[in-house]
């Protein structure tokens, strides 16, 4: 599958083109599904934060707006990785920014360490985020492989 990449993105400025961002939003919608009655998750996987007064009675438009806002924050957190900002943003939307970047006693992930060294062979590290409670979950593994195929720019 080939993508036409905007010139700012191709030049490595870390800007995610709208067409690719929209594709990521649609992918997450399909993968997450609609969360109703599964608090603290609402809409398309938004985790309620302390102080947020949202309820699970969101409209699809509100949930879409919330997803876009959350994904934009995730992509912005990885802006220094330029072409990989969207790929890392999509992953961090699901696993959390600090699981990748590290924080306090939590070390940086192998994926981030490899990218910081300039290594581009990251498929194995990306797909390694496929476990839940220490067990490999086949559906999560399929999702990671699909994300990598769609959003990795060599």
Language-model region placement:
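Bacterial N-terminal signal peptides
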Residues: 1-4
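Long, amphipathic alpha-helical surface segments
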Residues: 6-38, 46-53, 58-77, 97-154
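Structural motif
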Residues: 79-85
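Short N-proximal segments of mature Sec-exported proteins
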Residues: 85-99
């Amino acid at each position: 599958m080939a993508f036409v990449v905007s010139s700012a993105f191709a030049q490595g400025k870390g800007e995610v083109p709208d067409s690719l961002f929209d594709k990521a939003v649609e992918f997450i919608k399909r993968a997450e599904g609609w969360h109703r009655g599964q608090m603290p998750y609402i809409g398309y996987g938004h985790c309620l934060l302390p102080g947020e007064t949202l309820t699970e009675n969101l409209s699809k438009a509100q949930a879409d707006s919330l997803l876009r806002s959350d994904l934009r924050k995730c992509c912005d957190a990885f802006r220094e990785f330029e072409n990989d900002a969207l790929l890392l943003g999509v992953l961090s939307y699901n696993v959390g920014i600090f699981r990748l970047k590290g924080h306090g006693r939590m070390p940086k992930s192998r994926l981030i360490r490899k990218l910081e060294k300039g290594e581009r062979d990251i498929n194995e590290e990306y797909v390694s985020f496929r476990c839940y409670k220490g067990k490999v979950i086949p559906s999560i593994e399929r999702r990671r492989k699909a994300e990598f195929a769609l959003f990795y720019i060599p």
